[in-house]
Structure formats: C-alpha cells, structure tokens
C-alpha cells in the first residue's frame, strides 16, 4: 500500500510538471511567440528577442509582468515592441521600480502615485531626469561599498533609465513613423545620416546578421550600422538592407496593429534566418521555449510543497506525507538539474560564472545532499531543510538574474 501511494504521488507530480512543458497558445492575433524566437546579439552571445524583453524587465523592475495603465497585462515581447515602435505608449507603463522614498521625492512622487507603491512610468520620471542626473553624478565618485542607500538607488535608477532610452534606438529612430518608406528610398535614407548615426551609437542590440551564411557572432550589426553601411555599399549591401528593413516593416505593422502583415513578415524573416543561420535560429527558439517553461520556478513550487508536506508529516500520517515530501523533492531536483544543464548548453558556459549561477548551483548541491540524508533518516527533517534551502536559493537567483 505504501509503495502504491508513493507511485501515485510521483505520477501526479510528473504529470503536473509535464503540463508546464506544453507549448502555450499564442496570446492574441499577433505571432509574438514566433517573433520572440528570433535571435539577436547582446552581451556577447546570440539570444532570442524574448530573452531581451524578459531580462530588460527584470533589470528595471524586478519582474517580467507589465501592467497596462488601463488594466490588464502586457506580454514582455509586446512591451519591447512598444518601446521600439510606440514609445509614447511604452512611456506610460509603470516599469521603473523605486523603493527609496528620498529618490521618489526627487520626482515629487509618493508611494501612492505608483503601481503597487513602487513602480512608476517614464512619463512620471521625465520632468526631473536632470535632477536625477545631478544626484547620480554626485554619487558616482563615491566608492560603491561606501555609498548610502540613497546614492545606490539614484545610480541604479539612472542606469535603468539609460538602458530604457537606448532600447528606443534599437529598431528605428524614435518618433520617425515613416521609417519603413524611408529605408526603401536610397536618397531619403542617405539624407538621414544623423538619425542613423544616433542608432549606430546608442543601440546595444545587434539585430542584423552578417550578409554571408553562417558568419561569426561579432559580424552581427545594429540596425543603424547596417543601414549606414548598406547605403554606402549600394547594390552590394542589398542583403543587409533587406534584413534591416524587416525591423522597419515590423514597426509599421505594429503601429498600424496590422496582425496579418506582422505575422507574414515574421514568418518570412524567420524562414530566411533558418535557411542561412539554422543552428543559431534553432538554439534561439529553444531558449525562448526555456524562458516560457521556466523550470526553476516550477522547481521552486515543488520545494515549497516538499517543505509543507514534510512539516505536516510531523503532525499526522508521517509515512505517507513524509514519502510525498521526498517525491516532491526528487521531482524538483531533477527539474532543476535539467534546467542547469540546458542553461549551460544555451549559454555555452560552465555551470558557475556569476552570482546568479552560483546561487543556482549552491541550491542544487544542497538539495542533492538533503535527498541523500533523507534516504538514511526517514524523518522528513532533511526534506524540510532541502525544500527551504532549494526555495530560498532559487528566490535569490531570481533576483540576481
């Protein structure tokens, strides 16, 4: 009976985890999931657009969910598209997290002016950005370890605002709603050198692949650089111009909310990338899927379940609940192990390279040790400890990502 109960619990947990691995339906009529799988170069490696959107949001607000001013939520990729192509709308999203009350006072704001008391929009910050710059300039010469909480907060907020501002130059010059037509006219494109140079200088996303198939990652260019070089190269730069124009055409479709045109362009561009950069495109698609599956969050939930079951086993049904706690730990550990291995493959890096991966690895090792101890002493103490440690380290890793 005990063995049968254990198998039933294991089957339920595996089915639950399996349900999180199923592809989710695309929200709305725009193929945002398909666009999110397109690779771009950032921070020295190729990443899907989905990763750019999620990591950007994590950096500036500490979470991936975006709340629309009128209610509801906005997908991370949709938020990024608004930053690229509808900045006047993106500026109204409350995505800048500010916790320090003295930093809020710079902008004449209080906790009641922001979403959940700590998130504010660019529109709310814009009138006092000069004062933020002044305060950050005063704080920057101070050694990082010696800065006050206020100084750390203003320096960090300025970095977030600068990151957001640079994102706006990634796909087209901010405010140029006629950019698609302009990129199709060599004379107009050549005349707008200043805007293209601003894109080249400010954008950190290299979104245009090399003209030749394959190509090294360092041959990817940002849109401004690609358009400038294509304009100088003439007919020889046609391939680069075509790929750079994809982002201009995408912008027109997104501003017009023309889903059929948007989806057709995304499908054609992905087909082009798959034909010429197949390995990079497939790996990028896997990373976007990995982001949506989010195995570490599911592991976190399993570790919480393991802790609760272990604690409950000390009050009632020690055998059944203790065994259930161990099974939850087993499944959470296997899922976290798979997540670490896949992450290593996606990033082409060893398991420990920064604070984020250190937290993951420490938690993984600690949970593994607790699993071994629990098998020697079936009293659920190691299961409870493993659940608590696993959950805590994954929370820490989430905030370090």
Where are the predicted features?
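Amphipathic, alpha-helical segments enriched in basic
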Residues: 10, 31, 237, 244, ...
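Soluble extramembrane regions of membrane proteins in the secretory/endomembrane system
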Residues: 3, 21-292
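Hydrophobic alpha-helical transmembrane signal-anchor segments
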Residues: 1-24
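Core alpha-helical transmembrane segments of integral membrane proteins
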Residues: 280-400
């Amino acid at each position: 009976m005990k063995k049968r109960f254990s198998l039933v619990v294991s089957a339920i947990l595996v089915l639950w985890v399996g349900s999180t691995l199923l592809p989710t339906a695309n929200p709305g009529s725009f193929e945002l999931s398909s666009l999110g799988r397109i690779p771009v170069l950032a921070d020295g490696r190729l990443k899907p657009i989905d990763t750019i959107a999620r990591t950007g949001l994590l950096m500036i607000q500490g979470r991936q969910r975006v709340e629309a001013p009128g209610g509801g939520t906005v997908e991370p990729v949709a938020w990024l598209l608004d930053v690229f192509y509808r900045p006047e709308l993106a500026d109204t999203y409350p995505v800048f997290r500010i916790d320090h009350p003295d930093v809020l006072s710079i902008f004449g704001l209080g906790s009641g002016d922001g979403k959940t008391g700590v998130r504010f929009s660019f529109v709310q910050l814009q009138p006092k950005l000069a004062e933020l710059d002044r305060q950050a300039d005063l704080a920057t010469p101070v050694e990082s370890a010696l800065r006050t909480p206020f100084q750390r907060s203003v320096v960090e907020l300025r970095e977030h605002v600068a990151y957001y501002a640079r994102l706006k130059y990634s796909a087209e010059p901010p405010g140029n709603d006629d950019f698609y037509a302009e990129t199709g006219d060599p004379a107009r494109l050549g005349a707008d050198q200043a805007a293209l140079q601003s894109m080249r200088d400010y954008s950190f996303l290299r979104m245009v692949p090399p003209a030749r198939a394959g190509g090294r990652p360092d041959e990817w260019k940002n849109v401004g650089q690609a358009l400038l070089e294509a304009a100088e190269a003439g007919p020889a730069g046609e391939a680069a111009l075509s790929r750079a124009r994809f982002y201009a055409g995408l912008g027109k479709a997104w501003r017009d909310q023309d889903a059929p045109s948007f989806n057709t362009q995304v499908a054609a561009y992905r087909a082009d990338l798959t034909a010429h950069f197949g390995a990079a495109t497939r790996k990028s698609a896997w990373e976007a899927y990995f982001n949506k599956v989010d195995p570490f969050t599911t592991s976190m939930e399993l570790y919480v379940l393991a802790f609760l079951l272990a604690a409950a086993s000390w009050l009632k049904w020690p055998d059944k609940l203790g065994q259930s706690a161990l099974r939850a730990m087993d499944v959470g550990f296997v899922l976290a192990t798979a997540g670490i291995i896949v992450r290593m493959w996606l990033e082409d890096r060893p398991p420990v390279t920064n604070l984020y991966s250190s937290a993951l690895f420490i938690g993984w090792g600690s949970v593994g040790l607790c699993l071994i101890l629990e098998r020697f002493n079936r009293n659920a103490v190691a299961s409870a400890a493993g659940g608590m440690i696993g959950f805590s380290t994954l929370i820490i890793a989430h905030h370090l990502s």
